[in-house]
């Protein structure tokens, strides 16, 4: 397996929507974000987990930040909890089940030109984009 794809797959979060951008001839950026709302008793809760990372074409991690936490609120006040972890070790791997989403898109990722990106959901399916009337077309485009 290509080391770049293996590293991007290791950084991808379970359950997340992911965007991989070709920054320049030597690097890629991964944005993997997941969040959901829940409620119990009198509280509303928002849970989130996101990863932003830059990786070179050889699969070495330049930088990676994982931020996760939760926000609670009700009529009487708010609480929040957040954890931030910074990574710079080229051998670091995030254990998760989300690798298949990146592997499914390996050919698209490797074909990216500078400034291009590919976006996919937690199952690795290409995201549907909305086209506005100003673009001359209205509706959904795959």
Where are these regions (language model features)?
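Negatively charged, low-complexity tracts enriched in Asp/Glu with abundant Ser/Thr
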Residues: 2-38
